[in-house]
Amino acid sequence: MNKSTNIVWQKTSVKKADRQHLNNHKSAVLWFTGLSGSGKSTLSSALEKELFSLETHTYHLDGDNVRHGLNKNLGFSPEDREENIRRIGEVSKLMVDAGLITLTAFISPYQEDRDHVRATLAQDEFIEIYVKCSLDMCEARDPKGLYKKARLGEINNFTGIDAPYEEPLHPEIVIDTENQSIEESVQTIIHYLKDKQYI
């Protein structure tokens, strides 16, 4: 897929460490992964609001929103899902370089794709957050009506129904949204970020 030739990386005069120093916090990607309806978008949005109140520089990338623009030419085949996550990984890396804490809320069903994004970042810059919720509960919630459509055969390649979801092997954080409130979940992540001295 690498079609670019005759290009040279242009070094910048302002470094990532300079931006982190100015922002008074480390930059990182908080990578929320889980089934549709598990609570990724709700949790990541609530967390961003809390981080913002703590004067942290953040940006929130949501799966649906990104498919309205950057990834609007992609479908849901395994190949398109891989490219979707590759692009998000590259955008996230740019935002980390800009000194931001970037919150990404994507199903990102394949372990290999998540690992690829992790590999593009420094060791402590990728924080995988598994938003754990049973398929039964996600389907009962069904906030967008997608599970119903998938069961009726109106949507193909729907994760959890006729496409796989690979649970993270070693996530930094596991949030059980069946048993934890959004407020409790936000504080769990804030505690982690403070304990590891990101903020």
From Swiss-Prot:
Keyword Glycoprotein part of the UniProt annotation: no
Catalytic residues identified in the record: 108
Main EC class the enzyme belongs to: transferase
Pathway membership: Sulfur metabolism; hydrogen sulfide biosynthesis; sulfite from sulfate: step 2/3
GO molecular function: adenylylsulfate kinase activity; ATP binding
Pfam families, per the entry: APS_kinase
Protein keywords: ATP-binding, Kinase, Nucleotide-binding, Phosphoprotein, Transferase
Annotated CDD domains: APSK
UniProt keyword Kinase present: yes
EC numbers, comma separated: 2.7.1.25
InterPro entries: APS_kinase, P-loop_NTPase
A GO BP annotation: hydrogen sulfide biosynthetic process
Catalytic activity entry: adenosine 5'-phosphosulfate + ATP = 3'-phosphoadenylyl sulfate + ADP + H(+)
Lineage top rank: taxon: Bacteria
Residues involved in ATP binding: 34-41
Annotated function: Catalyzes the synthesis of activated sulfate.
Alphabetical list of NCBIfam families matching this protein: apsK, PRK03846.1
Family, per entry: Belongs to the APS kinase family.
Protein name (Swiss-Prot/TrEMBL): Adenylyl-sulfate kinase
Organism (species): Oceanobacillus iheyensis (strain DSM 14371 / CIP 107618 / JCM 11309 / KCTC 3954 / HTE831)
Lineage, top ranks: Bacteria, Bacillati, Bacillota, Bacilli, Bacillales
